[in-house]
Amino acid sequence: MPIVKVRENEPFDVALRRFKRSCEKAGILSEVRRREHYEKPTTVRKRAKAAAQKRHAKKLARENARRVRLY
C-alpha cells in the first residue's frame, strides 16, 4: 500500500493527487479489477497465450515494416 505523508501547509488536494499517482504506479487498481471475479486457470492461460501471440505478431509486423523502409 502506498504511503503518502502530508507535508506542512500542503493542501489536501495535492496530497490526494500524490496518493492517487503512487497507487497508479503500484498497479493497485488494475490488480483489484483483475481479482474482482474468479477466473479459471484455463482462462488465465488462454488469455496469456493470446497476448503472447499478439505481441509476437506485432513484433514481426514492426520488423517487416523496418525492412521495407531500408531500401
Swiss-Prot record:
Sequence intervals crossing the membrane: none
GO annotations of cellular component type: ribonucleoprotein complex; ribosome
GO molecular function: structural constituent of ribosome
Record gene name: rpsU
Name of the protein: Small ribosomal subunit protein bS21
Keywords, ordered alphabetically: Ribonucleoprotein, Ribosomal protein
Family: Belongs to the bacterial ribosomal protein bS21 family.
InterPro entries in alphabetical order: Ribosomal_bS21, Ribosomal_bS21_CS, Ribosomal_bS21_sf
Any Pfam family hit: Ribosomal_S21
Compositionally biased region (Basic and acidic residues): 60-71
Biased composition (Basic residues): 43-59
Region (Disordered): 39-71
PANTHER family: MITOCHONDRIAL 28S RIBOSOMAL PROTEIN S21 (PTHR21109), SMALL RIBOSOMAL SUBUNIT PROTEIN BS21 (PTHR21109:SF22)
Top-level lineage group: Bacteria
One Gene Ontology biological process: translation
